[in-house]
C-alpha cells in the first residue's frame, strides 16, 4: 500500500519522500519555482477558495468545521478520486504544504482521506 507523508515545502527534499506533490491552491510565499522540488502540483485537490478563506479568518475556532467541510469536498470530488488512482502505483507519496501550522492544515486532512481510501482498495 502507498505510504502518505506530509511535509512543509520549506523542508529539504529527501529520497525517501517518493513522489512529491504540492497540494496548496496558491504558490508558497517566498518560494522560487526553481527552488521547490516537486513532481506535480495538484492545486485542485486543495480546499475550495471559499472554504480556505473562511478557515483563515480564525483557524483555531473554525478547525472542526473546516475539517468536516473539506472532507465532504473530498468525498464528492472527481479530482480526489482521480488522484487516488494516480498515486496507487507509488510506494511513498509526500504531500507538500506551506502552512506554518503542523496540525491544523488541509494536508493532514487530505493525508487521512487518502490513507482511508487507499486502505479500502
Regions found by a protein language model. Name each.
Residues 1-121:
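Residues lining hydrophobic/aromatic ligand-binding pockets adjacent to catalytic sites
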Amino acid at each position: 500500500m502507498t505510504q502518505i507523508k506530509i511535509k512543509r515545502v520549506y523542508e529539504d527534499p529527501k529520497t525517501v519522500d517518493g513522489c512529491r506533490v504540492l497540494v496548496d491552491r496558491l504558490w508558497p510565499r517566498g518560494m522560487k519555482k526553481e527552488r521547490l522540488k516537486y513532481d506535480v502540483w495538484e492545486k485542485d485537490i486543495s480546499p475550495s477558495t471559499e472554504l480556505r478563506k473562511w478557515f483563515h479568518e480564525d483557524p483555531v475556532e473554525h478547525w472542526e468545521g473546516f475539517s468536516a467541510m473539506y472532507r465532504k469536498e473530498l468525498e464528492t470530488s472527481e479530482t480526489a478520486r482521480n488522484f487516488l488512482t494516480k498515486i496507487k502505483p507509488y510506494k511513498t507519496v509526500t504531500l507538500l504544504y506551506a502552512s506554518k501550522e503542523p496540525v491544523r492544515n488541509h494536508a493532514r486532512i487530505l493525508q487521512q482521506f487518502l490513507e482511508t481510501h487507499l486502505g479500502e482498495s
